[in-house]
A protein has these predicted regions:
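Membrane-embedded, lumen/periplasm-facing catalytic core of multi-pass transferases
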Residues: 1-109, 123-134, 139-170
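Extended acidic/polar alpha-helical scaffold segments
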Residues: 113-114
């Protein structure tokens, strides 16, 4: 039941990666940065960056680039060095962002007219579903809570959905 819920309700971040063109460019994440599935889904010529959003904590940092010459562990040059731009307070680091104008593609739940959707998938909005359930009688609250975590046929009508999109800059 849990696995089914994960695939049906929360798979959109992986699904949209299949629509990413196999060409060089910059894929940007805004408010949905924490749902980035993995670099395994991104073509090697695509660089992943972040654009400024309402989030004010620390964002992931890129590994150092260098010459991967060690045949046993080619990532040694990248992983054996201590990063210099980290803090232990989860403090905002402005150097983690790029300008939106540098982005070829954007992953977000909404955008203005300068972007066109390449692929959008439905995605359960946990916070909105939880808030909506607070106004319901107790049995409906329980149903909505269970429906977010486990797939129970027919119970997904108590969930609030939104679109999770891969967007391309309009020409």
């Amino acid at each position: 039941l849990r696995t089914s819920a994960l695939v049906l309700y929360y798979h959109a971040p992986i699904d949209i990666m299949h629509a990413l063109p196999n060409e060089a460019g910059t894929l940007c994440y805004a408010g949905e940065w924490h749902r980035f599935p993995s670099h395994f889904f991104v073509p090697p010529q695509v660089r992943v960056e972040f654009v400024e959003s309402a989030f004010r904590g620390i964002l992931p940092h890129h590994f150092r680039r260098g010459n991967a010459s060690d045949p046993l562990w080619p990532w040694a040059a990248y992983t054996r060095t201590s990063p210099t731009h980290v803090n232990d307070r989860n403090a905002h680091e402005p150097d983690r962002y790029v300008a939106l104008s540098q982005c070829s593609w954007l992953v977000d739940t909404h955008a203005d007219d300068t972007w066109e959707p390449l692929m959008c998938r439905p995605f359960v909005d946990n916070e909105a579903s939880r808030l909506a359930a607070q106004t319901w009688p107790l049995p409906a609250k329980i149903r909505a809570t269970v429906a977010r975590a486990l797939y129970v046929p027919g119970w997904d009508d108590s969930l609030v959905w939104r679109s999770y999109c891969l967007l391309r800059r309009r020409a």
